[in-house]
């Protein structure tokens, strides 16, 4: 493995470990070696540090330096889309499509379709997504990618008032035979779109049950949390927005730490709109594994000062933090609010 390849692998390992600062330093070393991957690493590091503007600036420099590297164009499109610059994002995807290998066009087309959907060009998004789903290279992109593409197709059907088509799309996915496991992350988004389709078709019971399944699949999915709030469709002028620190007992030992030891305790955070702490805890419990629900307790509650939003928002969970595990008697890690 060359020095550049080793540095790239090291940088991605730091990104995966939640250390974008070190990854950024490595990216700058790669830039001094005149390697185009430097721009990819630096941009991803800036994005992980919530500086998407700087990520875009780095990538714009990158595509000027290496205009034939499709990965840089695609990443530039993704970050421009995140900033709401959809026309510029689409230009980047078109440039990526002009230099990407045939087997990678399926990914470019998917991201292109997603930007069009975000922009509200639903018909164009559907046409671009059709290119993804009809590609001969779709299977090699992996099951999780296919699930993401199906979630987007279902989203487009729901957005155009076609819930039956969305439900049929899910049923076709469920019937597909496949050797590879998908992803609980992508499946949460699929189930979220299915819940919204049931809601739109008037089947409130299925909408709620499916939204609960989506949250159990991956509770950090914004789509799943939204589907659950939409399925309940509850608003109250007296509900309050709250940031809560929640503690509980995990249900099994941590295999990577002490597989034969006791199950750890945990602390996490939730942003919830509810009448009071008791209702907030009930809503939180639905997002947690059934085995831990009885152990849940609220350690701290901080009211979010946004009266206007609380009065009009749907009740439910809006965000949840990571788990911080610790053994009883140990000092738990501090949480970032």
What is each stretch, according to the model?
Residues 2-50, 78-81:
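Alpha-helical segment of the N-proximal tetratricopeptide repeat
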Residues 5, 37-40, 70-71, 105-107, ...:
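Start-of-helix register in tetratricopeptide repeats
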Residues 33-35, 67, 101-103, 137, ...:
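Short coil turns that delineate tetratricopeptide repeat
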């Amino acid at each position: 493995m060359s020095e550049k390849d080793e540095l790239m692998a090291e940088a991605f390992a730091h990104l995966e470990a939640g250390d974008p600062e070190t990854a950024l330093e490595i990216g700058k070393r790669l830039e001094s070696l005149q390697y185009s991957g430097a721009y990819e690493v630096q941009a991803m590091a800036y994005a992980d540090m919530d500086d998407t503007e700087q990520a875009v600036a780095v990538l714009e420099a990158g595509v000027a330096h290496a205009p034939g590297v499709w990965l840089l164009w695609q990443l530039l499109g993704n970050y421009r889309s995140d900033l709401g610059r959809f026309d510029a994002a689409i230009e980047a995807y078109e440039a990526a499509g002009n230099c990407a290998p045939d087997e990678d066009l399926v990914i470019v087309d998917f991201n292109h379709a997603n930007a069009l959907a975000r922009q509200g060009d639903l018909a164009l998004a559907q046409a671009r997504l059709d290119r993804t789903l009809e590609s001969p290279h779709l299977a090699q992109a992996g099951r999780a990618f296919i699930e993401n593409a199906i979630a987007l197709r279902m989203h487009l059907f729901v957005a155009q008032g076609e819930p039956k088509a969305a439900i049929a799309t899910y049923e076709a996915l469920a019937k597909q035979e496949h050797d590879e496991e998908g992803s609980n992350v992508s499946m949460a988004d699929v189930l979220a779109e299915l819940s919204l389709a049931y809601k739109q078709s008037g089947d409130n019971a299925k909408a709620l049950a499916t939204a609960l399944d989506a949250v159990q699949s991956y509770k950090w999915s914004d789509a799943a949390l939204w589907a659950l709030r939409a399925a309940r469709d509850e608003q109250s002028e007296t509900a309050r927005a709250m940031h809560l620190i929640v503690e509980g007992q995990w249900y099994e030992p941590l295999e990577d730490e002490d597989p034969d030891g006791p199950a750890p305790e945990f602390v996490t955070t939730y942003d919830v709109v509810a009448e009071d702490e008791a209702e907030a805890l009930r809503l939180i419990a639905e997002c947690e594994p059934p085995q831990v629900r009885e152990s849940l307790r609220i350690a701290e509650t901080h009211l979010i000062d946004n009266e206007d939003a609380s009065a009009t928002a749907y009740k439910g969970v809006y965000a949840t933090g990571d788990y911080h595990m610790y053994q009883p008697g140990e000092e738990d890690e501090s949480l970032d609010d």
